[in-house]
A protein has these predicted regions:
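Extracellular or exported targeting regions of proteins
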Residues: 263-264, 300
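A surface-exposed beta-strand-loop module
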Residues: 267-290
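Mature N-terminal, pre-catalytic/accessory segment of carbohydrate-active enzymes
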Residues: 294-363
Length: 363
């Protein structure tokens, strides 16, 4: 039966969200209910956020399961599935690929109370990777510790990744009217969203039930993102569909948006702290092709290290003088900053978390 542990319960929900089957099991024991509202407010909020994310990821999950059915490539794959020649791929059994675009590194350890962070040792494969939640950038081909608050689980998106999500808030079985795509820089990418009509019995990949919408990114020299008009069973998707395009980890750029070659207006916003550019397109015919161009290309961007350090230090249960001295070292020093931090603070988790941000973007 185990014992109540709100923190671990929140971590297990996070793991469940990035698993093939996500269910909250309990027993006849009246104390073992797993509904989020049975836990403390922090755990309840975290569970709710992750369960809503799971619902948003249905287009990604459904497409991954279609791929598993027809191509034999499972949703969850061990590291050695993709990197059989790498020794490290056999040494991290709890780390796994989740679909074609993501790498999941679950945390199941308790947070260190002073730092209010928990850590997990990870191997990051070659290439450039982006944290799906906090936008940190990692250069792969190495092992490192990843530290997160209880609100976060390390999930990394590869360069060029495209993650489709549903933004429909009401429950239902229909395909979404509002979609989002999280688009990560640094490489070309493509993702075909598979949907079905919810009625026709499936008898093969090419039967009449499927609708396919291809999303593609050309990163350089001139950045271009395309949503192709739906192919196949067009009746399976809404006639009109709204899109929210999130270009992650980029410098601000001015987009030109066209639908079948005709310019249309988009609502554009930029988060300079998280370095995310967002375009919102309303009521676009699903059968028409949308193209977003950035005339001068786009540049990859990373969050300011001092801002990241401030977030970590502001939460830490240590003296204010130490916090100020550590932040000053992050701002003024580069290669020697870690040595200075180690001379100021003895908490290895806190020092490790600061080391992660000092080196996560390749600096």
């Amino acid at each position: 039966m185990g014992a109540r542990d709100d923190e671990l319960a929140a971590r297990w929900v996070q793991l469940g969200v990035f698993s093939p089957i996500n269910r909250l099991h309990s027993t006849s024991n009246p104390f073992s209910g797993k509904e989020p509202w049975n836990f403390n407010k922090r755990a309840e909020m975290i569970m709710g956020d992750f369960l809503r994310l799971r619902h948003e990821l249905i287009p990604y999950l459904y497409t991954a399961n279609h791929r598993a059915c027809f191509e034999g490539c499972p949703l969850v794959r061990p590291l050695y599935w993709e990197e059989p020649e790498q020794k490290e791929a056999y040494e991290f059994p709890n780390e796994y690929y989740f679909g074609s675009e993501l790498l999941a590194v679950p945390i199941t350890e308790r947070m260190e109370p002073e730092a209010e962070l928990a850590g997990v040792k990870a191997w990051i494969p070659e290439g450039v990777w982006f944290d799906y939640q906090n936008s940190r950038i990692y250069r792969g081909g190495k092992q490192m510790m990843l530290y997160r608050t209880l609100e976060e689980m390390p999930v990394l998106a590869k360069a060029g990744a495209i993650i489709p999500r549903s933004l429909d808030r009401m429950g239902g079985t229909g395909n979404p009217n509002c979609m989002a795509a999280d688009i990560f820089p640094g490489a070309d990418g493509c993702f075909s969203v598979w949907e079905d009509d919810g009625r026709t019995e499936a008898d093969g990949e090419n039967d009449d039930r499927w609708a396919v919408t291809r999303l593609s990114l050309e990163w350089s020299p001139l950045t271009r993102f395309v949503i192709d008009g739906v192919e196949g069973n067009r009746s399976a998707v809404p006639e009109m569909r709204s899109w929210k395009l999130n270009f992650r980890n980029v410098e601000y750029g001015v987009p030109e948006v066209t639908v079948e070659g005709e310019r249309v207006d988009a609502v554009v916003s930029y988060d300079g702290v998280r370095t995310n550019l967002t375009l919102e397109l309303s009521e676009i015919p699903s059968v028409k092709t949308v193209e977003v161009r950035f005339g001068t290309g786009m540049e990859m961007a990373s969050m300011d290290r001092a801002d990241q350090a401030f977030e970590i230090l502001n939460r830490a249960q240590i003296s204010y003088d130490k916090k100020e001295a550590i932040l000053d070292a992050v701002k003024k020093q580069r290669g020697d900053a870690l040595l200075t931090i180690q001379s100021i603070e003895e908490n290895t988790v806190l020092v490790g978390a600061l080391a992660e941000i000092l080196f996560s973007d390749g600096n």
